[in-house]
Every structure is written in C-alpha cells, then in structure tokens.
UniProtKB/Swiss-Prot annotation:
Origin species: Rhodospirillum rubrum (strain ATCC 11170 / ATH 1.1.1 / DSM 467 / LMG 4362 / NCIMB 8255 / S1)
Keywords from the UniProt entry: Ribonucleoprotein, Ribosomal protein, RNA-binding, rRNA-binding
Listed name of the protein: Small ribosomal subunit protein uS17
Keyword set includes Thylakoid: no
Segment forming the signal sequence: none
GO cellular component entries: cytosolic small ribosomal subunit
HAMAP family attached to this UniProt entry: Ribosomal_uS17_B
Molecular function via GO: rRNA binding; structural constituent of ribosome
Subunit structure, interactors included: Part of the 30S ribosomal subunit.
Amino acid sequence: MPKRIMQGVVVSDKMDKTIVVQVERRFKHAVYKKFIKRTKKFAAHDELNQFKIGDLVRIRECAPISRRKTWEVVLDNAE
C-alpha cells in the first residue's frame, strides 16, 4: 500500500524532533457547489530539528513513532 504524502506549513516547532504541520484541503460542496477550505494539523517527525515556523514541508505516513506522531518529514533535494 503506498504511503500518503501531503504538503503543508509548519505552525509549531517547540518540541524536540517534532513539528506541527497544518495541511489545507479544498473541495466542492455537494449541494451548493462552492469551494470550501478545511485545515488539519499533523505532528510530524523532524530528526534534525531543521524546519522552522512558516516553512513549506512535505510529510508522509510512517509507522507510529509515538501516540500522536505517525508522519515524518520528506527530505527532497529541492529543500
């Protein structure tokens, strides 16, 4: 099964080796046909503590690291 990959903005980096990423999704309302934005926050593993608030990052699913952390930061060559 492929792992999900999402893109979002870092909203918190206060924890050690953990960042909170806010992911925004857009969808069309079934009845009113208006586009709606919804956001969700994910705790992601940042091994090197290199990402700061406001950074645009990509995260992917992984095996559970702690109770709330099941995502890790994807390190691309572009970053």
